[in-house]
Curated annotation (Swiss-Prot):
It holds the Pfam family RmlD_sub_bind. GO terms for cellular component: mitochondrial matrix; mitochondrion; respiratory chain complex I. Complex I is composed of about 45 different subunits. This a component of the hydrophobic protein fraction. The keyword Transport applies. It comes from Dictyostelium discoideum (Social amoeba). This is NADH dehydrogenase [ubiquinone] 1 alpha subcomplex subunit 9, mitochondrial.
Length: 356
């Protein structure tokens, strides 16, 4: 599709030849007009996902033409097309198992960003299919691009009991072997409007008869989805980022207990029981009940294994501060995201009893 478009409309894709973006920063060569471009083309795998759409928006604002590989129906990428000017966002149908379709999606690009990932298995794709085989396939076909960014996950380890963590670690390792000068991003737990973090725990506090508290003293460092996108854009704009590994996380560190207290305040579910439970109990419930009978289970055994550690940046790691990105405090977003899960009677309460 992309090749046909470029033949029929030579000006559709404007590739900047002989650019030096691999070592030098991405330069904004336009001066104010929205319709002017930098001459750069970026392919973003995972652009139709939760965090991908924010990155597409920022790249388009910068004047970069964005190729969006998709495998969904047209409705899945339609909202992305309005994030840029006419012809700036280019959807291309692809199959993650088909090398030819991947090559077609990156054939005109200076920049390739792999944000495609999966934290649960489906009937069509296993964790290894996406996080290992697809990651290495995309990297192998992108060896000649000028800038390659691979998005992994924080605390990924080949020795982890979590299949997700192991698959992410192996995918990252293979990518760095194929493209030694690629930039790796390891984001922490991500929150935002469509997340599976604040929304998930808010639903649990609303629908469950009790709130299970496990991993109570393990620490977390949540990251806002827009900060992840801003960090990736800053990597493109900052010199000397090639071949480096960045760990993206928020500035604030909480224990799971402190986070759940914030969820209870946000949802006003003060009457719910708070029951400390062991990891083994939660894994049993998840594996034998939720994953078997729930269509969209709130808890997955593998994710419980993955979160059974401190989800914080490691000492000495490069972070968003090194890219001059200011992070968003979770308190700024949590109330707005969780208030929809409050009980109806909460909105009938008298704000000031003296003025009945």
């Amino acid at each position: 599709m992309l090749k046909n478009l470029s033949k029929g409309f030579p000006s559709l894709i404007n590739k900047r030849s002989f650019s030096t973006i691999n070592e030098n920063p991405l330069t904004r060569i336009h001066h104010g007009s929205r319709t002017q471009t930098t001459g750069l083309v970026a392919t973003v795998f995972g652009a139709t996902g939760f965090t991908g759409r924010y990155l597409v928006q920022l790249l388009a604002r910068t004047g970069i033409q964005v190729v969006v590989p998709y495998r969904c129906e047209d409705e899945g990428f339609r909202d992305l097309k309005v994030l840029g000017e006419l012809g700036q966002i280019i959807p291309v149908r692809f199959d993650i198992r088909d090398s030819e379709s991947i090559e077609r999606a990156i054939s005109h690009s200076n920049i390739v960003i792999n944000m495609a990932g999966r934290d649960y298995e489906t009937r069509n794709f296993s964790l290894d299919d996406i996080n290992v085989h697809a990651a290495s396939r995309i990297a192998d076909l992108s060896k000649n691009v000028e800038k390659y960014i691979h998005v992994s996950t924080l605390r990924a380890s080949e020795d982890s009991p979590s299949h997700f963590s192991r698959s992410k670690a192996i995918g990252e390792k293979l990518t760095r072997e194929i493209i030694p000068n690629c930039t790796v991003v390891r984001p922490s737990i991500i929150f935002g409007d469509e997340d599976k973090f604040i929304n998930k725990w808010s639903k649990v506090s609303q629908n469950w008869p009790f709130i299970p508290r496990y991993n109570q003293q393990h620490k977390i460092q949540p990251l806002h989805c827009y900060d992840l996108a801003s960090g990736i854009l800053s990597i493109l704009e900052t010199p000397g980022t090639s071949g480096k590994v960045y760990e993206f996380a928020g500035d604030e560190v909480f224990t799971w207990d402190e986070f759940l207290d914030m969820i209870i305040d946000g949802t006003a579910q003060y009457s719910k029981l708070n029951i400390p439970v062991s990891n083994d109990f939660m894994k049993f419930i998840s594996e034998h009940l939720l994953e078997r009978f729930a269509r969209n289970p709130n808890f997955i055994k593998d994710q419980i294994d993955y979160h059974n550690q401190d989800m914080t940046t490691t000492v000495g790691a490069l972070t968003l501060k090194d890219l001059n990105v200011t992070t968003t405090p979770i308190q700024e977003k949590l109330i707005r995201l969780s208030r929809m899960y409050r009980p109806g009677k909460f909105f009938n309460a008298i704000a000031n009893p003296q003025n009945k």
